[in-house]
UniProtKB/Swiss-Prot annotation:
GO terms for cellular component: Golgi membrane. The keyword Transmembrane applies. The conserved DXD motif is involved in enzyme activity. It is a single-pass type II membrane protein. Glycans are attached at N100. The chain crosses the membrane at residues 5-25. It comes from Mus musculus. Keywords: Glycoprotein, Glycosyltransferase, Golgi apparatus, Membrane, Signal-anchor, Transferase, Transmembrane, Transmembrane helix. One of its GO terms (molecular function) is acetylglucosaminyltransferase activity. Residues 1-4 are cytoplasmic. This is Alpha-1,4-N-acetylglucosaminyltransferase.
Length: 341
């Protein structure tokens, strides 16, 4: 009897220690810790779920600015049952980040249960894809737009390998995207690469990676990004004009209406930083691309300004607004993320 009591107490102690360890690691872990029961295969199982929302940072920056934080938080809010994975080149096994005031955005995102930070190892990522030979030969130090070009390449490889949805880090999610294989239209005959989604190993993305290498010219802005998606879509499909708000379908790829992600086109990007008499509902949109790369003036989200962008932050990324806008008096990094177009 006494032996059984000791055994029971030992099991309880082991369980309690394990729970305490998980809680401790959750508050201090460098990568947001993997849920042990949902993804028994660890990181590989997480990635290969095929349902993840992916973000990428190809610079060495590890503390997301407010707009990036808002993009990630809003995605986690809209897709609570799906992993939100943020690939960061600046993450290393040797780097030690802790949850403290030096990294407020990293801390608040790490505390969200379905957000995970993952190191971006591009050589490993590109292995077994058409991009590997290009990556091992290219001289990144001579590339004018390397951060953006490498981001264009990485997003193709990630979604081809693992499936899921890629989003730029200046995209605020509003409602779930119901499509599996899709591209986002900026116009009737022009695709973006700021938001797209595919099932794993989709042949369209393999063809995109081949074209990326065959027609590589990083001196032309967008040649490896939206222009690549557009020219490949034209090979696969006979593009037609949109009629009304309906999406287009080509083979098993949906070409989504510009209203889905770009209700405010890039020439009018400043409207996000203006006060509207009547705020738009964006009922036809799945997410909003804020065109942060166009923001050369360094416009910021200002607390109490009642601008459209402030209202979007308050509604769709309230933690980011509270910690990084209210807590920092509206200061926003003037440097766009490498996942911003």
């Amino acid at each position: 009897m006494l032996k059984e009591i000791y055994l029971s107490l030992s099991l309880v102690l082991v369980f309690a220690c394990g729970l305490l360890y998980q809680l401790t690691m959750r508050s201090q872990c460098f990568f947001a810790c993997l849920p042990p029961f949902s993804f028994p295969q660890g990181l590989d199982g997480l990635l290969r779920s095929g349902r993840s929302i992916m973000f990428i940072e190809t610079s060495e920056r590890v503390e997301p600015p407010p707009m990036v934080s808002c993009a990630v938080e809003s995605a986690a809010k809209i897709y609570p049952e799906q992993p939100i994975i943020f690939f960061m080149k600046g993450l290393r096994d040797s780097v030690q980040l802790t949850s403290n005031t030096s990294y407020p955005a990293f801390s608040l995102l790490s505390a969200i249960n379905n957000v995970f930070f993952v190191p971006l190892d591009m050589e490993r990522l590109f292995k077994d894809t058409p991009l590997f030979s290009w990556y091992t030969k290219v001289n990144s130090s001579t590339e004018k737009h390397w951060l953006h070009v490498s981001s264009d390449a990485a997003r193709l490889a990630i979604i081809w390998k693992y499936g899921g949805i890629y989003m730029d880090t200046d995209v605020i999610s509003l409602q779930p995207i119901p499509e599996e294989n899709f591209l986002a239209a900026q116009g009737s005959r022009h695709s973006s690469n700021g938001v797209f989604g595919f099932l794993p190993h989709h042949p369209f993305l393999w063809a995109c990676m081949e074209n990326f290498v065959e027609h590589y010219d990083s001196t032309i802005w967008g040649n490896q990004g939206p222009q690549l998606m557009t020219r490949m879509l034209r090979v696969w499909c006979r593009l037609k004009d949109f009629h009304g708000l309906g999406d287009l379908k080509c083979l098993n790829i949906s070409f989504l209406h510009p209203q889905r992600f770009y209700p405010i086109p890039y020439p009018q990007w400043k409207r996000y930083y203006q006060v509207w008499d009547k705020e738009p509902s964006f009922n036809e949109s799945y997410a909003l691309h804020l065109w942060n790369y166009m923001n050369k003036e360094g416009k910021t989200v200002v607390r109490g300004s009642k601008t459209l962008v402030e209202n979007l932050y308050q509604k769709h990324c309230p933690k980011t607004y509270r910690v990084l806008i209210q807590g920092a008096e509206g200061t926003v990094s003037k440097k766009p993320g490498t996942g911003s177009r």
